[in-house]
Amino acid sequence: MPPMKDSSNSTPRTDEELQEVTVGELKPHNASITLLEYDPRWPKLFDREAKRIRSVLGNKALQVEHVGSTSVPGLCAKPIIDILLVVTDSADETTYVPDLEKVGYTLRIREPDWFEHRVFKGPDTDINLHVFSKGTSEIDRMLRFRDWLRANNSDRDNYARVKRKLAQHEWRQVQHYADAKSSIVQEIMKRANAT
């Protein structure tokens, strides 16, 4: 899941709040976060999944992008490929969910109050497929953050330091780890948006 909707609020979402947006059972993590050094195979895994998504959705897949830490060379990451999928209307699940399910994707998150965001788990690779509607501001934010970290080693390295420090803690939910990164993400985005 992405950082908290209101990233100025450092209070992690409760299990009840997370269960509200989770499709199926919310299972606690209750462990530290595993981060791996950058793996050059990650872009290849993305390419394979992007082809799978495009093959089943055709022109309904308006944009398919590799996002998140695995998309930034030199950045440590949870070994989960984050993919951004842009469709015409993410709330209209009938237009894309059955097709994604045919190739093994499973809907896990439905956030109607946050840009109609959806998250699917991948069929045979650790994948978080984030689905947004065309024109949603979060699309630009995700791409700008990725591109900024790719081009700015000092921010990439600072982000990695914060991630490593936070990853050592035990987190009840993985989302709490993501929420804890909100302040560093905001700090970096201020610089990215100033250009």
UniProtKB/Swiss-Prot annotation:
Q: Which InterPro entries does the record match to this protein?
A: GrpB/CoaE, NT_sf
Query: Span of the secretion signal?
Result: none
Segments for region (Disordered): 1-21
Q: Where is the composition biased (Polar residues)?
A: 1-12
Question: SUPFAM superfamilies annotated for this entry?
Answer: Nucleotidyltransferase
Pfam families in UniProt: GrpB
In terms of superkingdom, the source organism counts as Bacteria
Q: Belongs to which family?
A: Belongs to the UPF0157 (GrpB) family.
This chain belongs to the protein called UPF0157 protein BH1888
Source organism of the structure: Halalkalibacterium halodurans (strain ATCC BAA-125 / DSM 18197 / FERM 7344 / JCM 9153 / C-125)
